[in-house]
């Protein structure tokens, strides 16, 4: 069973700057590859797959050094979000994927757990590229961490949500109502 734990974060100025850069880089990657997929389909009537986007992103990182600053998993997850948006468009007949705007009030990115790069340490949480970030909450995450989603609310507050697996969740009693 999976369970999510949400914590309020208190990043310092340097960490806030890196988080905001990561939001911008994820938006840039999503929009660039959405435009590229549209262009490739218009010109060749072919689809530009996630695998092609991912290998192209590696080349793009060599050209644009500022794309090396954020966490690599956040950029890959932006591509996965784009792939999921396309799959939903074709399978579930939802709307065509839209470009992400700077002017929205909510920003978020997701990063994956690998080799202990995300770790809960009491009043702090270790995140990739950010290091130790102060958090406030008394709950202790149980189970194995799968990923972390870093988000910023319109009020300017930062949050981190940990998705954990192998968590035992108590079943409610049947009230027969």
Name each region found by the language model.
Residues 1-177:
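Nucleic-acid substrate recognition interfaces
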């Amino acid at each position: 069973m999976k369970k999510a734990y949400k914590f309020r974060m208190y990043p310092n100025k340097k960490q806030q700057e890196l988080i905001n850069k990561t939001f911008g880089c994820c938006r840039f990657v999503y929009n660039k590859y959405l435009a590229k997929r549209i262009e490739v389909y218009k010109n060749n009537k072919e689809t530009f797959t996630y695998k092609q986007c991912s290998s192209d992103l590696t080349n793009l990182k060599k050209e644009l050094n500022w794309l090396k600053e954020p966490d690599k998993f956040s950029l890959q997850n932006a591509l996965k979000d784009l792939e999921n948006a396309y799959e939903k468009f074709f399978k579930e007949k939802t709307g065509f994927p839209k470009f992400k705007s700077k002017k929205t009030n909510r920003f978020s990115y997701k990063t994956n757990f690998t080799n202990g790069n995300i770790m809960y340490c009491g009043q702090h949480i270790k995140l990739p590229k950010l290091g130790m970030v102060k958090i406030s909450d008394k709950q202790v995450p149980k189970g194995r961490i799968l990923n972390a989603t870093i988000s910023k609310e319109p009020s300017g507050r930062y949050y981190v949500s940990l998705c954990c697996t192998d968590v035992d969740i108590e079943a409610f009693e049947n009230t027969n109502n």
